[in-house]
């Protein structure tokens, strides 16, 4: 199938406009928009065949925009695939599912197999870009939800360590280090998950590591083994209430210092360039008498986070 020329022309105009105004584009290749036809026919990324479809897409846009785009991200918030809701958001492993979204069945074997195919696809795209377009810089994108142990109970510390490993570190370890970490091998064994791999996959993953790391940061959570802790709101990730933090109207805990902590942790782990690509505040915005929204609270939120950078 040939790419949609009108769609390609649209992004030509977007990138030309960016250049006109001195804006450097950063393109996410796949951002929660897997074509539903691929869900219906292949059960999304559960099928290895999607790697070829993804590469055809990458080759088309790389060649088309090679003189307009330098920075690329292979998948948006790929680590959401480690969570049950990731079957809808990230992996598309929902063939036959009609909703509601909070009732999506949790098939860990399917989700983590789909993630493996995405890791291989990402590595293939990075390797292809490096070989054919040496001016390109290829990155990953992680939904980073920093968490703390709620108490100094060692059981809480271990629970938080495991949560951070699965939710935050696993996918970026794959992208940056190019191999499965030991903690995931244990997780797979404990959850009866068997990742089917082709003989060449290990070499592909190792050869296709990213040049830079990007992430979204909105909030932090607390993790505990204690049953009496208060829950706190979130998006697809919920945790326990941190008594030292305020929360947004939506229950997301506001933690600017957590961003500083997160930047330190990520850079010490990987030693590659970092970029915060999502950050902001959701609120019940109301128009004042002049018909405008005077959201000084949002300015305060952004200022506090920028100061930590």
Question: What residue spans do the PLM features occupy?
Answer:
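Active-site-adjacent substrate/metal-binding segments within catalytic domains
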Residues: 1-11
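Active-site region of glycoside hydrolase catalytic domains
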Residues: 9-308
